[in-house]
Amino acid sequence: MLNESEKEQLDQHGFLLLERLISSDTTLQLRERSLTLAAAEQETGASHTYLANDSAQRVWNLVDKGEIFEEAIQQPKMLAAMEYLLGADCTLSSFTVNVLYPGAPDAGLHIDYPLSGLPTPRPSFPLVANSVWFLDDFTLENGATSCVPGSHRRLEALPESGVEYTDELQICGPRGSVLIVNGAIWHGSSENRTNEPRVGLLGFFCRSMLKPQQAHLKLVSDEVVSRATPTLKRLLGFDSLPNMNA
């Protein structure tokens, strides 16, 4: 479901913005559910916060926290991009809410787990990829994702903390968009200088030979498994043997 131009964008630049991929109604429902979950975890003291002053928050294991997330992570165009990068038997590594609260600082550029721990030169083919779901408009002011185009081909270098790269850009777009990011590209969230939270989802995928960030087989309830589609079961790792023909 990717055209040749979209494939070339991923190959050459390491990212692809799919504007307004998600309907307005679904985007609103995802945002409301995400903020409800974030608030509930704060109230119970179980929230996962990071950055200075706990100004950013993740909510993990979304597949087990509402049917709307089960459906979202199977979005066909997004999955087509992941399968193009990681193979037809790719696996869901984690699915999280990511909230940047007002005042959240620039997170700095990085490459995704587990790439920074690999010996160099790192593999020239993608091992992991992320989908960044814009549940708000992503703007220059509220923490839009920054990246250095083409940096996924720098197989030995890593981004240096505090360095401003002349080719770094912020990827802005309307709510309902999904940004596909090769995990090897230098990327990170920027500062939220507004008075409102910037809400997104992170659907992180890996090749089937890699260990996912989350142990879905232990974390996902029997109820979710019982209604899961074949696609969702495969993404969660229930199809444990990789497709040798992929």
Regions found by a protein language model. Name each.
Residues 64, 73-74, 148, 181, ...:
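A conserved hydrophobic position in a structured secondary element of the catalytic/binding core
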Residues 1-13, 19-117:
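Non-heme Fe(II)-dependent double-stranded beta-helix
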Residues 23-24, 99-100, 138-140, 152-153, ...:
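Short, solvent-exposed loop/turn segments at secondary-structure junctions
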Residues 55, 65, 93, 127-129, ...:
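Residues that flank catalytic or metal-binding motifs in active/ligand-binding sites
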Residues 154-180, 184-186, 190-246:
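Conserved double-stranded beta-helix
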Residues 104-172, 210-220:
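Catalytic core of non-heme Fe(II) oxygenases with the double-stranded beta-helix
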Residues 94-97, 131-133, 201-205:
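A structural signal for short, well-ordered beta-strand segments
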